[in-house]
Amino acid sequence: MRTVVPFDPRDPKSRLAEFFADAEERRGFAYAMLADVLGAVRDAGGDPVVVATAPVSRPVDAPVTVDDRALSTAVAAAIADGPLPTAVVMADLALATPDAIRRVFAASGDVVLAPGSGGGTNVVLARTADVPVSYHGVSFRDHVTAAERAGLTVTTVDSFRLAADVDDASDLVDVFVHNTRRTREWLIAGGWRLAVDDGTPTVVREPND
């Protein structure tokens, strides 16, 4: 199944600016997560295509199309222009596994949605070109409402693996616990480790010698 993976290589993960040393380090982290998502999609039987807001500066194991429009506009165009069904999987789902993505691919309905933990939408599967998409605000609720108003059937896939996107430092604990691919290895190589401070897990960086 064709699977669009939106990716912003320009200034990724700005909410992690206080955690990483600089923008280049954040960019490296974003590329590691992208590689994990592409691998999970491919292992699930998907055919990933990256839709990037700018040309990528590092090797990416998938075709790349540049579209600098807003996320909702770019995703809607990718669904309308491509073969159906088309899935859309966010590039920061570092916990995503092939099994979790297969659940989306196998689900019935004109629209299949996997919600994010903060009310967003982390995965969309469209079986019709007129699926309404909007990634602003409480997008999961908005996607359900818009699809139902359009007379489309909606299926929700409730998955911890697909709900957990990585936006702030607290999310990195889950990466250390649940990720077994490149993202965790990238963090370890950079000197980060999982620690427990007074019973609370956290991710810390070892000081340079």
From Swiss-Prot:
Record keywords: GTP-binding, Nucleotide-binding, Nucleotidyltransferase, Transferase
Group of enzyme by EC: transferase
Pfam families associated with the record: CofC
InterPro entries (alphabetical): CofC (IPR002835), Nucleotide-diphossugar_trans (IPR029044)
The organism sits in which domain of life?
Answer: Archaea
Pathway as given in its UniProt record: Cofactor biosynthesis; coenzyme F420 biosynthesis
GO-annotated biological processes? F420-0 metabolic process
Q: Which reaction does it catalyse?
A: (2S)-2-phospholactate + GTP + H(+) = (2S)-lactyl-2-diphospho-5'-guanosine + diphosphate
Q: Which GO terms describe its molecular function?
A: GTP binding; phospholactate guanylyltransferase activity
Q: Which Gene3D superfamilies match?
A: 6.10.140.50, Spore Coat Polysaccharide Biosynthesis Protein SpsA, Chain A (3.90.550.10)
As recorded in UniProt, its EC number(s) are: 2.7.7.68
Q: What does this protein do?
A: Guanylyltransferase that catalyzes the activation of (2S)-2-phospholactate (2-PL) as (2S)-lactyl-2-diphospho-5'-guanosine, via the condensation of 2-PL with GTP. It is involved in the biosynthesis of coenzyme F420, a hydride carrier cofactor.
Cite the NCBIfam families for this sequence. Answer: F420_cofC
On assembly, the entry states: Homodimer.
Question: Which family, according to UniProt?
Answer: Belongs to the CofC family.
Q: What is this protein called?
A: 2-phospho-L-lactate guanylyltransferase
* Species for this entry: Halobacterium salinarum (strain ATCC 700922 / JCM 11081 / NRC-1) (Halobacterium halobium)
Q: Which gene encodes it?
A: cofC
